[in-house]
Amino acid sequence: MPTTQITHETIADIPLLMHILHDQLEYDKLLDQIDPPHGNWQGLSLGKTMVTWLTHILSEGNHYMSHVQDWVAQSSHLWTGLWGQAVRPLDVSDDRLAEVARRLSLSEVWEPLEQKITQRMVRVYALATEQVRLDTTTAKVYGGSDVSVLFQRGHSKDHRPDLRQLKVMLAALDPLGVLVGADVVPGNTADDGLYVLMIARLRSTLPAKGLLYIGDCKMGALATRAYVVRTGNSYLTPLAQVGGLPEQLDKWVDDAVRGKVHLQPILDVDGNTSLGEAY
């Protein structure tokens, strides 16, 4: 009489994450369309390998490549069922994950993938695309050398000028904070020149005109503001308090208070609620 062997595997939140990443957003299909696997690539495709890795990152809160292979091996039957094909732990070895990361670092792969992912996310979740917030951040590293491309010393927001860092320009839909663009640049790159590059990319992903771009005073550079207006969009940014601007600002406010200029009411979207006056 044949015996039945029962295998227990912990599924945790893996099916839920796969439903979102694979079934709803189809990240694996998008990457495989943009960067089809080489003929000698066996097992999980590049896109499926990426989604498996993303699932590990989100489920385990761990981005280390070396941990993914053992993690998949613990649930091999689950992964075979989810992907509909045999899944080997070697399909997600650190060598393969490194190749995924290398491919994603190529602009000819990353930029169209980011565009398609954003468009699909906006469509699936019916996100409002009216306001985009732009900002930069830095991440310090304890390695790197003089020949490093990304890891450079620059103005440190972590107050650690002795450490090398990389810089990231991020674009997110307001008010949800949904990320729609990311550029990774060397840590000594000035912020000013990153805004136009990001906005130009977003114009092929989001509506090209009619958006409000929001940023800090570094977005207030004249060239950036001119580009936003020239492309049919609006901007909201504080002007940097440098040069003669503080004195000019005092005069502008004084003129408004003394009634020397004509003030126009600013109304909320309902057309009735007054938000203030300006000129």
Question: How would you describe each model-predicted region?
Answer:
Residues 137, 185, 218, 239-240:
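Anionic group-transfer/hydrolysis microenvironments
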Residues 190, 212-223, 241-244:
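Acidic, metal-coordinating catalytic cores used for nucleic-acid/nucleotide bond scission
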Residues 146-155, 186, 199, 222, ...:
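Short secondary-structure boundary/capping segments
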Residues 164-166, 173, 184, 234-279:
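An anionic, glycine-rich sequence signature occurring as long contiguous blocks
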